[in-house]
Amino acid sequence: KQTAETLLSLSPAETANLKEGINFFRNKTTGKEYILYKEKNHLKACKNLCKHQGGLFIKDIEDLDGRSVKCTKHNWKLDVSTMKYINPPGSFCQDELVVEMDGNDGLFLIELNPPNPWDSDPRTPEELAFGEVQITYLTHACMDLKLGDKRMVFDPWLIGPAFARGWWLLHEPPSDWLERLCKADLIYISHMHSDHLSYPTLKQLSQRRPDIPIYVGDTERPVFWNLDQSGVQLTNINVVPFGVWQQVDKNLRFMILMDGVHPEMDTCIIVEYKGHKILNTVDCTRPNGGRLPEKAALMMSDFAGGASGFPMTFSGGKFTEEWKAQFIKAERRKLLNYKAQLVKDLQPRIYCPFAGYFVESHPSDKYIKETNIKNDPIQLNNLIKKNCDVVTWTPRPGATLDLGRMLKDPTDSQGIIEPPEGTKIYKDSWDFGPYLSTLHSAVGDEIFLHSSWIKEYFTWAGFKSYNLVVRMIETDEDFNPFPGGYDYLVDFLDLSFPKERPSREHPYEEIRSRVDVVRYVVKHGLLWDDLYIGFQTRLQRDPDIYHHLFWNHFQIKLPLTPP
């Protein structure tokens, strides 16, 4: 089983005193040495240990840029800004450690152990027959994999919204999607976000196959934490440890890996059939702490960006329309370059961008739809092709990739079978009604007749002893105060509910939320992702600081049972 090990911790004072460029540290308890490289707000870290023969690195006095260190044994040089050895050039890459902030402005250096768990029991790839392994794209992050005589499905979101009512499917799934799901031998669900764990989809599946085997990683917050409340009857959910091969049959196995070093929520997966690896990093920011298998047969990952309320839902101060547009453009470009570099580094035979095909299609979210520009998968694939020889696939719903054909000859016209001419690719209607009326049913609930629910809810939530005052305002569709709605302050320092802001110095945040969504979230004890990632809030803050502990608590750490 894979575990995360803390190698070094720095106090808030030591972290604040990190200088630009190279910093050397020693863990006084273990005697082990480490290097931290700081460039503006970005930190990189590695062991102070030369890969050649284990020598110690010291400052390289010939380096005027302050980026490289020199080994005391044979003068090998490492550029710590890229983690690549520059003398001799093209020799090694240094293994990066994960830098984690601890919430109090200190930091940890962490290593996953074992770092490359897929190397246990390695298998030599065997030749695949044509048609033996087929991958069919259904929609968003949902793939249907035929692997010999087994079928596996990733992240089925085929109907309904995600994040309350903020996200809707961009692509029209193939009409036989439910039959495909019912035929699956196993389903992998990467994490609890509703564009991957879709209860409306699973409800339809469970009516036909309640015992379908579903596999999830052993995350800190269980993926299916809300199953009982959802009313969906699924009886075969399997929670598996990270970094351990799960054998399906003699040819097929899979391994679930964590994101970064925090098994809080996100996971990714390696599926291996007859020695050929399919790597799906899903939404992971730093899958497996940045260590991934190279030369996989097929790699797929998210690419689009825009999966957050920031900055579209913010106003005041610097948040002008011009600033937002520039920020979004720059962030999307950074993400595009990062994904292209990752593909270049990992050198899969084939790469497929997916898990970004959503749209803010409800008319009330027109502003978000127009502002929240996503990356174009074709643009990413063109960037990849410019940098390396990886074959790329921009999937259309119902399109099928034949892995055996593509590995043998990427130019084979039968390698990717597109959906028939005239197949509907993009959705142009969504069944808003039933989903919105479910949310709206919470508005008139008797628990909201008296303001006593406010204290009860935030006491249940359990976040306190933090200097932050939040004003919560219930609103209509257009974020204007809801007639007869609640407008109140919460002081999280002592968890009080004052009539006006306290006189002490305090950070302040104002959160306007659509009344149907916020009351539904409160009543059912749901996570605030529905509000924030679902674009159901408008925010102002003073000063302009991201309160990680506050948001992390309400997005991941709320109690598992409703108030």
Curated annotation (Swiss-Prot):
Pathway: Amino-sugar metabolism; N-acetylneuraminate metabolism. CDD domains: Rieske_CMP_Neu5Ac_hydrolase_N (cd03473). Its main location: cytoplasm. The keyword RNA-binding does not apply. GO terms for cellular component: cytoplasm. It is found in: Cytoplasm. This is Cytidine monophosphate-N-acetylneuraminic acid hydroxylase. The lineage of its organism: Eukaryota, Metazoa, Chordata, Craniata, Vertebrata. Its cofactor is [2Fe-2S] cluster. Its EC number is 1.14.18.2. One of its GO terms (biological process) is CMP-N-acetylneuraminate metabolic process. It catalyses: CMP-N-acetyl-beta-neuraminate + 2 Fe(II)-[cytochrome b5] + O2 + 2 H(+) = CMP-N-glycoloyl-beta-neuraminate + 2 Fe(III)-[cytochrome b5] + H2O. It is an enzyme of class 1 (oxidoreductase). Belongs to the CMP-Neu5Ac hydroxylase family. GO terms for molecular function: 2 iron, 2 sulfur cluster binding; CMP-N-acetylneuraminate monooxygenase activity; metal ion binding. It holds the Pfam family Rieske. It comes from the Eukaryota. [2Fe-2S] cluster binds at C50, H52, C71, H74. PROSITE patterns: RIESKE. InterPro entries: CMP-Neu5Ac_hydroxylase_Rieske, Cnh, RibonucZ/Hydroxyglut_hydro, Rieske_2Fe-2S, Rieske_2Fe-2S_sf. Sialic acids are components of carbohydrate chains of glycoconjugates and are involved in cell-cell recognition and cell-pathogen interactions. Catalyzes the conversion of CMP-N-acetylneuraminic acid (CMP-Neu5Ac) into its hydroxylated derivative CMP-N-glycolylneuraminic acid (CMP-Neu5Gc), a sialic acid abundantly expressed at the surface of many cells. Residues 10-108 form the Rieske domain.
